[in-house]
Amino acid sequence: MDKKAARIRRATRARRKLQELGATRLVVHRTPRHIYAQVIAPNGSEVLVAASTVEKAIAEQLKSTGNKDAATAIGKAIAERALEKGIKNVSFDRSGFQYHGRVQALADAAREAGLQF
């Protein structure tokens, strides 16, 4: 089993558990160059809010789109957008990535901005 397959296996297991709970999920995906965050409805078929470093408005404010500063900016942005839509409580779905570095920075920034998980 290669590294990507192991990550996907971890992500699938966590998503199944969150689906059983019927929770609204804050999903994080990262690549070496960008980081993405989405708030997904409990049924899993609808993206309620999204933010990523691909967005021109956010990318222009950042020196680099693939570091902790970028992850912090995305965490704040996703929290602000979720709160505008009335979403306060979410379950954090790290997509099988380690809770470290950019993933942790995004989560911490979202918590500081008012999301609860």
Swiss-Prot record:
One of its GO terms (biological process) is translation. Keywords: Ribonucleoprotein, Ribosomal protein, RNA-binding, rRNA-binding. It holds the Pfam family Ribosomal_L18p. Signal peptide: none annotated. GO terms for cellular component: cytosolic large ribosomal subunit. HAMAP family: Ribosomal_uL18_B (MF_01337_B). Part of the 50S ribosomal subunit; part of the 5S rRNA/L5/L18/L25 subcomplex. Contacts the 5S and 23S rRNAs. This is one of the proteins that bind and probably mediate the attachment of the 5S RNA into the large ribosomal subunit, where it forms part of the central protuberance. NCBIfam families: L18_bact. Belongs to the universal ribosomal protein uL18 family. This is Large ribosomal subunit protein uL18. It comes from Pectobacterium atrosepticum (strain SCRI 1043 / ATCC BAA-672) (Erwinia carotovora subsp. atroseptica).
